[in-house]
Amino acid sequence: MRNHIANKIEAKDKSLSKILNDERFKIDVFQREYRWRRKHIEDLISDLAISFLSNYKIGDGLDKYDSYDSYYMGPIVLCENNGSLSIVDGQQRLTSFTLLLLYLNHLQNSLGIAKESQKDLNKYLYVTKGGKTTLILDIDTRESIIKHLYENPTEIFEGDLEDESVRNIIDRYEDITNLFPEDIKNADVLPVFIEWLIFKVVLVEVRAFSMENAYTIFETMNDRGLNLSPTEMLKGYLLSKV
């Protein structure tokens, strides 16, 4: 029975809301820094804006987003093992969506949108389980920079800038701030965009139940625009055997 479960693989379409809600993800085997560059963020925001604005009509309210076309972001690969859920492939996109949600959270406040029209985005950033509150993407080295961007994004970060991921997170958040389209940056459109982003942006969640199967899937898939070096792939494979 255990072997049957270990060999099981599930694939489901899931909205961003369903993926980032009440889960805690580890990135503890296939170690990979956050490496997206400005071009990746530019492409992501452009694609999202084009898809959303091709559906949105002036005057649309929050009740209209559900009739809009979905936007598919491709697969992510997860491994569920011993009660823990690890991201094997897809953390570049999920980290980028986390940064976008942080930005949108501040933007909806700064635009003076009525509280009843604001979306509670905290539940897509943090999760509380077993009395412990952590980032949904539970990576210790990123906790301080994400907290900083959540609380004081306009101030200079005084934490550790030696970490490649921390530096890239700061730069990519700034890119989001500079690149987010003016057509969506107003109190009428933004709430509809946020609802659409959360519920109509869809990823294919591929879930394996053993690291061996997860690694096999991992070899055939990659984050958008990023390739792993042979050394990184070998490291991931060796760590999966520990």
Model segments located where?
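Glycine- and hydrophobic-rich flexible loops that cap the catalytic core of alpha/beta enzyme folds
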Residues: 2-242
